[in-house]
């Protein structure tokens, strides 16, 4: 966590450290976020649903009995066994679809296609080390331009376009770590500040799953 609070599309999320702080934040119709890597708070708060949105492509320990409604995003979960519902995260016809038996589509490792560009859009760290950014999100970059350094090793733009994603400056990355992505749609500057079509679709699927579970 790098910020104490952040706002996306008029919805503010606030970092909290206690249940009391979380309740106070939610009373203001804001989102409370708590750092809890071991999930210790799950058994300490009253909740109707648990959503595993880690997107690790595998189940890191979520079980179906953790909440009245348990939801897993993407591959790694078996609906009806690990969780009650799986939400499809693969771009395409089934994105956001609810799965009540079985699994989501397996991870292909291939980024979604935008204007004919797929693998070229994503930049991975050429080595392990500390990231030192030269460019920032929203910058227009040209193919071959240096966007960052890993220690002293330069990282080059894989294509020309809008720098839509970039790992935090000072982050310690491993070799091959996904650290940036470029959008060929240079005129869609606002995409850097708004919820993506994919995230909105998956979020809608989560909401549908919760409402269906409560009905």
Question: Where in the sequence are the language-model features?
Answer:
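Well-ordered secondary-structure scaffolds
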Residues: 1-215
């Amino acid at each position: 966590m790098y910020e104490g609070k952040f706002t996306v599309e008029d919805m503010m999320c606030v970092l909290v450290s206690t249940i009391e702080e979380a309740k106070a934040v939610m009373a203001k119709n804001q989102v409370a976020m708590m750092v809890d890597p071991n999930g210790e708070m799950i058994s300490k708060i009253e909740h109707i649903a648990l959503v595993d949105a880690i997107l690790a492509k595998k189940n890191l320990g979520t079980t179906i009995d953790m909440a009245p409604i348990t939801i897993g995003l993407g591959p790694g979960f078996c609906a009806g066994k690990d969780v009650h519902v799986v939400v499809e995260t693969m771009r395409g016809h089934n994105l956001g679809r609810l799965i009540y038996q079985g699994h989501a589509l397996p991870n292909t490792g291939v980024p979604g296609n935008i204007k004919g560009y797929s693998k070229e859009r994503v930049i991975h760290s050429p080595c392990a080390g500390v990231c030192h950014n030269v460019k920032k999100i929203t910058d227009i970059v040209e193919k071959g331009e240096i966007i960052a350094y890993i220690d002293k090793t330069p990282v080059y733009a894989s294509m020309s376009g809008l720098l839509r994603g970039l790992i935090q400056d000072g982050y310690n990355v491993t070799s091959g770590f996904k650290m940036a992505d470029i959008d060929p749609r240079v005129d869609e500057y606002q995409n850097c500040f708004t919820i993506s079509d994919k995230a909105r679709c998956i979020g809608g699927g989560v909401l549908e799953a919760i409402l269906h579970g409560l009905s």
